[in-house]
Structure formats: C-alpha cells, structure tokens
A protein has these predicted regions:
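Thiamine diphosphate
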Residues: 1-26, 32-55, 63, 69-71, ...
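Extended, hydrophobic alpha-helical segments in both membrane/secreted and soluble proteins
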Residues: 49, 61, 68-88, 97-101, ...
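Short beta->alpha connector loops at strand-helix junctions that form conserved
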Residues: 64-65, 89-90, 148-151, 285-287
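Short beta-alpha junctions and helix-cap segments that line functional grooves
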Residues: 100, 158-159, 271
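Conserved glycine-bearing catalytic or ligand-binding loops at nucleotide- and phosphate-handling centers
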Residues: 148-165
C-alpha cells in the first residue's frame, strides 16, 4: 500500500490504476476548456485522481475532509452558483451521502457530476470497500443519469457528457484495477420504432438520431439460426469484456447472440429496452448488487414497455449476474468473480440454460395453440 494518511487510511500517493489515471488526465483537459469545472473530494484527493488538477489549478480543487455528506451539499451550492462540481469519491463512501444526493442535488436538478472510483468488487481492500451498492441505490433517484464505461474511450466520452449536463445529476462509475483492452463497436443502437417487432426477427434497426444518454453499442452480433432462441448479453461497464467473451463462446456453439454495452445504464436507455423486448433471452452482467441493480431495472422497463404497447409475443427470459446480497469476503477480484459466476464461461453457461428454458416454453405455447 505504501505511505497512508493517518486519519483516513488511504494511500497518500495514488497508485497508477488505469481507470483513475485516465480520469485524472481527462478532468484536467476538461477543466482547461471550461472554467466552471471544479473538483471536490472528501480526504482522498490523490487516490481518486484529483491531484494533477490540484497541482495545475490549485483553486479548482476543494478537499472537504472526511465529510462526504458535506461534499455533496457543498457541490449542490456550487452548481446553483454557476459552477460544475465534479465530486470524486470511492464508490463505497457515497453510501454515507445518499440523502444529500437525493434531497440536495437531485431534487433541485443540480448539475453535479459524481465520479465513483473503485466501483464494484475491489477484492483485497476488504468487505467495507467493495463499491457494490451504488447502482442499486442510485437507480431510485429521479432524474439521475449513471454511466458505466467499458474502456478508456467510453470513460472519456462519459465524462464529457457528464460535465456538459447542467440540469441533472450525473454519475460515472468504474472499477479498481487496470483498464481492459478496448472493444470496438460494430454499430450503435438508437431510439427507433416504438412498436415491438413481430416474430422477434431482429434486435433493433439503427436510426440516425440518439441522445448521449441513449447510446448503446453493439459489440457482437450473429445471425439467428432458424427456430433458435435469440440471446441478448448486456455487459454493464467493465463487465462488457466478459460479456463479449461469453458471446464468442455462444457464437461458436451456434447460438444467435448479440452483445451490447449501454454507455449510460440509469435510467435504462430506450434502445436497450426495445432491443431486450425483441429477443427470447436477456442476460445482464454487472459489477454490482444484483438485487435492484441494472438487470432488475431493465427487466422492469421491458415489462412496462410491453404492457404499454400490447406486446403479445411473450416476455424474454431474464438472467441477472452480479454480486449477491451479502457482505463480500476479502479475496482477489478474480476469485470473487469466479465465486459469483461472473466469468465468461459462467455467463455463457447461464445463457445456454436460459435459452433451453425459453425454447421449452415456446414449444409448450405452440402445443397449447394447437
């Protein structure tokens, strides 16, 4: 760990985690071009990557001490005064300030950006430092937008969108550790036709206009075999790489599979909802709490969409993969991902089983129709 702060126990000098280093570089670049941007943190200025900004622009970073609640209320005040605060915290410590996010920031639609470092499984940092609660909690905050980038490019893009949003709170979350290899999108889904497709023949067709909050990248797409169940794998944030690898395994098996990565996951993007409504199986993989997380939010959104549009083709089978509702033991991130079935092979197997179940249900429906 190296030298630590005697009060917080955090490293005095930030380790060169890939995600944190990219944030540190990008926030300096953004601040150079926008004098409204100011960094705020709670006794973790160096570990979260705000030190380079403080070194270059000392008056543009405020460390409020071990006071996350104050950091959020203070940032709301800065936003009301015309600034755009970027509050950088460890994800687990945002739990302390949920009331302030809800009542001081979101209620007033304050343009505050919250950057959550060490989101998801942190492993050897211990049970208290797993940043697994944020998405399940923040999904219930009206008007809030949350991004979960998959790599360096999408992290930079999400930060640019976040600091340009002045009428709502934005959150950008990423895990501890090295950046994964970049994944190039084949195409992007966009907000399109409102009616669900009969026969579930295609995931979704592109349309030319899409809000930044509705961006969904298609990472892998294989054509469906006749009569086979269509599988949609949704990789949330850094889990997109595992979802992509699982999609490759399913493709080798001859399954019809599409792998997507939504840049912003709260609220569920409209193109993702319509895509999920058009398939037989949806598997959502997230580095966070399963109960109430992104998979749960997407499932509810699909049900509402189908009810609103009178869909008659049946609901997709949902499988949610992530962190169970428990305090997580101290272990390596790799070991915990294996324990929770979050590796590519586990994801592929869960999708296969769900596809078998969907095929059986479809056969039963056909027999009843006769």
């Amino acid at each position: 760990v190296g030298q630590i702060h005697p009060e917080t126990g955090l490293p005095v000098v930030a380790e060169r985690f890939g995600w944190t280093a990219v944030f540190a570089e990008e926030i300096v670049s953004l601040a150079r071009g926008d004098e409204r941007i100011v960094g705020v943190t709670a006794a973790m200025q160096a570990p979260v990557g705000l030190q380079p900004l403080a070194d270059e622009m000392p008056t543009r970073v405020i460390d409020v001490g071990i006071a996350e609640q104050h950091a959020l209320t203070f940032s709301a005040g800065l936003a009301f005064a015309g600034m755009h605060p970027v509050v950088a915290l460890y994800a687990t410590f945002l739990n302390r300030a949920f009331d302030q996010v809800l009542m001081d920031v979101a209620l007033h639609r304050a343009g505050v950006t919250i950057v959550l470092d060490r989101a998801g499984i942190t492993g050897t940092d211990g049970a208290s430092h797993n940043g697994m609660w944020d998405m399940a909690l923040l999904a219930h905050v009206p008007g809030l937008h949350l991004a979960a980038p998959r790599d360096e490019a999408t992290l930079r893009e999400s930060l640019r969108t976040a600091v340009s949003t002045g009428d709502a709170p934005t959150v950008v979350r990423y895990p501890k550790g090295a950046l994964p290899e970049p994944l190039t999108a084949l195409r992007r889904l966009a907000r399109g036709a409102e009616e669900p497709r009969a026969g579930k023949e295609s995931v979704h067709e592109e349309t030319p206009h899409v809000s930044a909050f509705d961006v969904v990248d298609v990472l892998l797409e294989s054509r469906p075999p006749a009569g086979g169940a269509r599988i949609l794998l949704v990789g949330v944030g850094a889990m997109a790489s595992q979802a992509y690898a699982a999609g490759r395994l399913l493709e080798q098996d001859g399954h019809a599979v599409t792998v997507v990565h939504p840049h912003w996951v709260i609220p569920a993007p409209a193109p993702l909802v319509t895509a999920a409504a058009d398939v037989d199986v949806v598997v959502v993989v997230e580095d966070g709490l399963v109960d109430g997380g992104i998979g749960s939010q997407l499932r509810d959104a699909v049900e509402e969409y189908q009810a609103a549009h009178g869909a008659t083709g049946g609901s997709p089978v949902f499988r949610r993969i992530g962190v169970p509702r428990q305090f997580v033991d101290t272990a390596t991130r790799a070991q915990l991902m294996e324990d929770f079935g979050m590796r590519a092979a586990d994801i592929a197997q869960a999708a296969r089983r769900a596809a078998d179940g969907a095929a059986g249900a479809r056969t039963d429906q056909d027999l009843r129709a006769e």
